[in-house]
Amino acid sequence: MPHVAFDGWTQATFEIARKDVGLSEGDAQLACPRKELDLICAWSRQLDEEAGKVIIKADLLSMKIRERITFAVLERLKRVNRHEEAARRARARLLLPDAASDAPQLLWATADTIWRAVGDTSTDVNFYSKRAILSAVYGSTLSSWLNEDDTAKPDAHAFLDRRIQNVMDFEKTKGQLTRMTADLPDLEAMLGKIRHGAGL
């Protein structure tokens, strides 16, 4: 991490790290064929795992769902506190074209870790919508977190609160729409019948 903070996530710093831990070139290639990119991904997964363990041990039952998510997101964000510059450099590296698919995958993995840790058991479309929404919330809050010099992160906390409120408002509106349209014809079923040649 010290090398990354100064020189960024590059193949050169990967080679320095490899030599620091005494890993052969062959073993390093097997472990991280994409060198620094695979190292970033491994680091993110490690932070997910660390945060997940803390979240699971918390008294989640005493919290409302909004409080659980806020707590869980903050626990994950705190994992980068020791290496904020490395996290900034990782974010910059993930913006390059060869990492186009990595950033969204890592955000999704973080969101999945958080939802599972707080006890989410959804398996339907909600499984995907929850993770997609939380990925956006976490990603934007991480940017706010890393851009704030104050170690207490008051602006990032406030930003997270606003984002989660937006999500809660959306879910409330979605619930109202679901109730309003409950008695309408099932369009999906109708289309399915048409597709398979069944009459209405």
What is the meaning of each model-derived region?
Residues I65-R79, L106, T110-A117, R163:
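C-terminal ligand-sensing/allosteric alpha-helical core of TetR-family HTH transcriptional regulators
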Residues D98-D120, K130-S135, G139:
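Amphipathic alpha-helical packing segments from all-alpha helical-bundle domains
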